Amino acid sequence: MLFLFTISAYFIICSLILDKSKKSVLKDQIGINKEHGIFPSDFFSIYGSSCYFNMGVLCIFSTLFVLLINGDLNGPTIGAIFSMAGFGCYGKNLANSVPLIIGVSLASLISISDINSPVTVVCILFSTGLAP
């Protein structure tokens, strides 16, 4: 858990260091969240190092989600979290990921397995791959 938050903090700090003005990172984050993520949407070529901030936010959000539902932080779950963070540079943001997470979480309530089972957690996190 601490490792994931450290990686997230690293992404956020890198975006603040690499960007000239700190206000532009937050302004770019608002712009990133307004993007639809339709192919091609390379956030790095559009927003530069501000996309690292988006990667850190997605990593923190997905880790907190797993902890909130009492899911296990095992290998596949951490891989799914890194997948979310990685695609934060190419089309994925909170605005297009949260509706999918909510929808799959609601769908898991009528399924056989619990919402915090490893299979369901990995399905929820990888379903955000539909977002970009």
Question: Where are each of the predicted segments found?
Answer:
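Alpha-helical multipass membrane-protein architecture
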Residues: 1-132
